[in-house]
Structure formats: structure tokens, C-alpha cells
UniProtKB/Swiss-Prot annotation:
Protein name: Cytidine deaminase
Organism field: Vibrio vulnificus (strain YJ016)
InterPro entries associated with the record: APOBEC/CMP_deaminase_Zn-bd (IPR016192), CMP_dCMP_dom (IPR002125), Cyd/dCyd_deaminase_Zn-bd (IPR013171), Cyt/Deoxycyt_deaminase (IPR050202), Cyt_deam_dimer (IPR006263), Cytidine_deaminase-like (IPR016193), Cytidine_deaminase_bacteria (IPR020797)
Pfam family, one: dCMP_cyt_deam_2
Binding site for Zn(2+): H102, C129, C132
Active site, renumbered: E104 (proton donor)
HAMAP family referenced in this protein's UniProt entry, alphabetically: Cyt_deam
């Protein structure tokens, strides 16, 4: 990761690389920029807000894991708190393409798992595909969400997705990233399973009712959570494992570091993530133990 950042710094404008390097090369950099950090960079570089976000995209793309396409995409979302969160596309060797995570989904789920309850804007390298436009339409802030592309005027999501189909068309009032706690608890004393339940309580699954969460523990002892993000169009839904894997990559860890995994889901769900979770983790490392609980 450090070498990717160094390459991006070498290609960035000098005023940006000089002031950004101490931030992103720090051991505790977590793929996000606080409002204070971003405002300081604006002053130090003399760039506009839009220009700086676009200039930061190569640093978001540095997190890309794309062994199949070798097409590295970065995205940056700004939460309602003002914090900026990086994201990048993620692919898996030996797993069907439906498990792929797009850069927009990565950045959005990053902000979501860090506690944001909505987004004001998203900045991306390339025009968002239909899959991602639909994914963003599930957000609590979809009506106001702005999209910034390089060398283009900022537009709202619904300029890219007119006459959209969304949760309201299915009679659903809840939205992805809205504050929620589903109230699940378990008597299981396994610490990793307890964390998976924590993620489950934040999940969004109004269509299948498969409220679910994943927790991954790595060799470092750190735990990464993923909550299920369901979508009105079904296919753009983001499984809890992928959300957890995104958090892991954006923390600078590697899939090879995963020691154990836990999945918990509602017994009332019309689907199950168990088989896909097991098969995807097996493709990463067949020795990863997976604990499972249905509540």
C-alpha cells in the first residue's frame, strides 16, 4: 500500500503531495480525511473543493483490489459530518463476478460502517454504471446526493438516474444509512459472534428481511464488521461479507491476514448468506473457520 501511495504522490501536483504525504503515509491513516484536514489542504493547495476531491482520487484508487480486470477505480464520499471517505473496487479470483464490489459501493459502505447517516456528495474517476446508480438510489440522502466526475460539472444523482425505481415503489420507507438498531442479542459468549450481531443490528434488509452481519478477525487482532445492504432492485445489494472485506482493505490489511469469520442472520429471512459467505472465504483461504448463528 505504501508504494501505491508513493506512486500517487509522485504524480500529484507538488502542492498537494507535499502537504498530503504526512497524512496518508502515517501509520494510523484510515482511508478518510477529517473536515479539518480537508480544509487545510484546500488552503495549502489553492484548489477548489471539487478540484481537490478529483485530485485525491488516485489515492482512493490505491486501495483497489482488481486481480481480474486490473482496472483500478477510486471513489470518495463526503458524509453529512463533513468527513471524506475513500473507497475502491474489489474483485475475487475464482469467485463468480456477482461478488465484485464497485468503488462507489466501497466508499459508501466505508462511510456507513464508520457511523455516517447520509452523504452529501460522491467523487469518482468514471461515470457511475447503472448498478451503482441504483445502489446509490437506496441511500437516505439519494434525493440530494451530488456526483462529481473529472472535468465535468457536478450533477445530482437523479440527473444520472431519471424516472428512477426505488424503495418507495415497493412501499418501503426505510433507507440505507438511516440510523437504526434492530435490537438483536445473543447469549453466545464468542466475542467475534457478538461483533457480528452488532453489525446485524445496523443492516438494511426490508425486502427479504434477512437482517445479517459479518465480523472478520485478522492476525493483528483487529475486527472488521460488515452489515447487509439490500437494494430495491435486488441485484445491487451488497452482502455483509463484502462490506466487512472492504473495511479490512481500507484499513491497510490483506485477505491473507484473516484468521476467523462469524456470520449471523435472521431466521425470518427469505434468503441466506451462508453458502456465498463460505464459498467466497474458501476462495480467499480454505482454512478460514466460519462460525454461524441464526437468530
Amino acid at each position: 500500500m505504501k508504494s501505491r501511495f508513493e506512486n500517487a504522490l509522485a504524480s500529484a501536483p507538488e502542492s498537494l503531495s507535499r502537504h498530503l504525504a504526512p497524512i496518508i503515509l502515517a501509520a494510523d491513516f484510515d482511508a478518510s480525511l477529517s473536515t479539518v484536514q480537508f480544509d487545510e489542504l484546500l488552503k495549502q493547495t489553492g484548489m477548489t473543493d471539487n478540484q481537490l476531491r478529483v485530485a485525491l482520487l488516485p489515492f482512493a484508487a490505491a486501495y483497489s483490489y482488481a486481480p481480474i480486470s486490473e482496472f483500478y477505480v477510486g471513489a470518495i464520499v463526503r458524509g453529512l459530518s463533513g468527513t471524506l471517505y475513500f473507497g475502491a473496487n474489489m474483485e475475487f479470483d475464482g469467485v463468480q463476478l456477482g461478488q465484485t464490489v464497485h468503488a462507489e459501493q466501497s466508499a459508501i459502505s466505508h462511510a456507513w460502517m464508520k457511523g455516517e447517516q447520509g452523504l452529501s456528495d460522491i467523487t469518482i474517476n468514471f461515470s457511475p454504471c447503472g448498478h451503482c446508480r441504483q445502489f446509490m438510489n437506496e441511500l437516505s440522502s439519494a434525493k440530494e446526493l451530488k456526483i462529481q466526475l473529472p472535468e465535468r460539472e457536478e450533477k445530482k444523482l437523479h440527473d444520472y438516474l431519471p424516472d428512477s425505481f426505488g424503495p418507495s415503489d415497493l412501499g418501503i420507507e426505510s433507507a440505507l444509512m438511516s440510523q437504526v438498531h434492530h435490537g438483536f442479542a445473543t447469549e453466545d459468549d464468542d466475542a467475534l459472534m457478538q461483533r457480528a450481531v452488532e453489525a446485524m443490528n445496523r443492516s438494511h434488509a426490508p425486502y427479504t428481511h434477512n437482517l445479517s452481519g459479518v465480523a472478520l478477525q485478522t492476525e493483528s487482532g483487529r475486527v472488521y464488521l460488515g452489515a447487509y445492504a439490500e437494494n430495491a432492485a435486488f441485484n445491487p445489494s451488497l452482502p455483509p461479507l463484502q462490506v466487512a472485506l472492504i473495511q479490512l482493505l481500507l484499513a491497510g490489511e490483506r485477505f491473507e491476514n484473516i484468521q476467523s469469520a462469524a456470520l449471523v442472520e435472521s431466521h425470518k429471512g427469505k434468503i441466506s448468506h451462508l453458502a456465498c459467505t463460505q464459498s467466497t472465504l474458501e476462495a480467499l483461504n480454505p482454512d478460514i473457520p466460519v462460525s454461524y448463528l441464526s437468530l
